[in-house]
A protein has these predicted regions:
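Short cysteine clusters
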Residues: 129
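Bacterial N-terminal signal peptides that target proteins for export
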Residues: 2-15
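Glycine/aspartate-rich loop-and-adjacent alpha/beta segment that forms the canonical ThDP
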Residues: 135
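Substrate/cofactor-recognition hotspot
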Residues: 132
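Cys-dependent protein tyrosine phosphatase-like superfamily
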Residues: 2, 23-126, 138-203
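Bacterial N-terminal signal peptides
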Residues: 13-23
Length: 203
């Protein structure tokens, strides 16, 4: 809608009021989502754009769509054969990134995962594996360290809150999280040094 700014100030005031009310209603809706129909084990909300949990049952997909989820990402290697159909029938997108609980995620898997979860068209996403603990815990830790600036200790603490078992059960995955953060931190520091040099050279 076009509003002439100089000749119709009353319309402008009305438009601003409508926009403010709409923004307030949207924020209130996001803050008061109804999770009562979610029965997924180990379910949690990492951010407004990211949910996590265990393998959903058939009844859970409409419930996920009901809280606004647009994309389901399955991290299991041999997930349920009918999951894609159930997800798409509920109006959501489906992706599978096959991971194991005994091997580090590949660079290709990490790149695909971060691309999917950071694409606004896919958000909010729901990320799951079988129990929502190990593969989901690791990939959510990468999300936290990459997007939220968390260090490895902070990310691992959250993994434990969702029942991740590091030693002796899954030492490879735990070590991977700490190694990933070390590499990420080194890259950030190198980029900061390059930025500082560029600023100094421009003066």
């Amino acid at each position: 809608m076009f509003v002439h700014l100089t000749r119709k100030p009353n319309q402008l005031k009305i438009l601003i009021a409508v926009l403010l009310i709409a923004a307030s209603a949207s924020a209130e809706t996001r803050g008061n989502l109804d999770f009562s129909k979610i029965r997924i084990k180990n379910f949690g909300q990492t951010s407004e754009a990211y949910y996590r949990g265990a393998q959903p049952e058939s009844r859970d997909y409409p419930a996920l769509a009901g809280i606004g989820v647009k994309t389901v990402i399955d991290l299991t290697r041999d997930g349920r054969a009918d999951e894609q159909g159930l997800v798409e029938h509920a109006g959501m997108r489906f992706y599978r990134i096959p991971l194991t609980t005994s091997e580090r995620p590949s660079e290709a898997a990490i790149a695909q995962f971060l691309s999917l979860v950071n694409n606004p068209a896919n958000q909010p996403v729901f990320v799951h594996c079988q129990g929502g603990r190990h593969r989901t815990g690791v990939m959510t830790a990468l999300y936290r360290m990459t997007n939220d600036g968390w260090d490895a200790n902070h990310a691992y603490e959250e993994m434990r809150q969702y029942h991740f078992e590091g030693f002796p059960a899954h030492p490879v995955l735990k070590q991977f999280v700490f190694d990933y953060y070390t590499k990420l931190d080194q890259t950030r520091q190198a980029n900061n040094r390059q930025d500082e040099k560029a600023v100094g050279a421009s003066k």
